[in-house]
């Protein structure tokens, strides 16, 4: 997969607000536009392949959940287990490996373009690197929310297809929050790597090594998923603990852990941008 680069100048506050004042006119303060930065990040994101791939991956995960439930349906019905079984089986491999790598590739492709277009240097010259970071964080949060909605939507459709009670679904919907935050944390991690490393290949190699290492640790001790940012999606989905999927305490704990990672990585990203600039 080749990285898509962009050499288009990043929008500044002046370009977002309109033409510059005429010489001799009243002085006008240049205010960085977060909205323009957010819009620009959405515009240049590699959406053409990421969203179809996310739908396909979540569909495959949901298919695994469907088949697992049908294979052991009598045993699950005897335990009165429905949504939690499909949720856990659908998200296990998806959250451990495939979806985190897809999210990472989506973010790394955009990050590699910043170096090719020398966008960080241009933003530093205009003192807009802070606005650029905020725009990236907002776009990453938006993409994370849509990713979480696709995942939850496909699992919901699978459960309804199996005849589960739709009224019970409300207990599981709060999982959208930690899943969104987990995807966001992965994106911010890769954005930070994108400041330190310049090539798409270097970013994805590093991400893959982190993922494999974290996967081995989480299999040995599921609680260790909290210390691995690439493993946060498994923690957010509660894939190892199906009985806790509907637990608000579990949702809150996972959300706090993911949000803490977002904060730490966002600070690292900001510091990295300052050094790069």
Question: Which residues make up each language-model segment?
Answer:
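Alpha-helical membrane-protein architecture signal
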Residues: 31-39, 84, 130, 134, ...
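Secretory targeting signals
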Residues: 25, 49-51, 56-103, 107-109, ...
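Aromatic- and glycine-rich beta-strand/loop motifs that create alpha-glucan
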Residues: 2-56
């Amino acid at each position: 997969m080749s990285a898509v680069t962009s050499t288009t100048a990043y929008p500044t506050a002046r370009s977002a607000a309109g033409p510059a004042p005429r010489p001799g006119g009243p002085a006008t303060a240049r205010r960085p536009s977060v909205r323009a930065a957010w819009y620009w990040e959405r515009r240049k994101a590699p959406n053409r392949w990421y969203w179809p791939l996310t739908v396909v991956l979540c569909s495959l995960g949901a298919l695994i959940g469907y088949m697992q439930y049908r294979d052991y349906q009598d045993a699950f019905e005897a335990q009165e287990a429905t949504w939690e079984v499909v949720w856990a089986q659908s998200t296990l491999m998806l959250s451990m490996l495939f979806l985190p790598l897809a999210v990472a590739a989506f973010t790394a492709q955009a990050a590699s373009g910043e170096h090719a277009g020398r966008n960080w240097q241009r933003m530093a010259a205009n003192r807009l690197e802070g606005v650029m970071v905020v725009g990236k964080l907002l776009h990453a949060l938006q993409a994370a929310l849509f990713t979480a909605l696709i995942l939850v939507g496909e699992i919901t459709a699978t459960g309804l297809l199996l005849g589960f009670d739709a009224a019970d679904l409300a207990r599981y919907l709060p999982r959208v929050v930690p899943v969104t935050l987990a995807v966001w944390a992965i994106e911010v991690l890769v954005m930070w790597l994108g400041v330190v490393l310049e090539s798409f290949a270097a970013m994805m190699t590093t991400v893959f090594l982190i993922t494999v290492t974290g996967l081995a640790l989480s299999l040995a001790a599921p609680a260790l998923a909290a210390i691995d940012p690439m493993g946060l999606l498994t923690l957010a989905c509660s894939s190892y603990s199906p009985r806790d999927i509907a637990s608000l305490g579990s949702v809150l704990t996972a959300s706090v852990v993911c949000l803490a990672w977002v904060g730490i990585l966002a600070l690292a990203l900001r510091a990295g941008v300052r050094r790069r600039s």
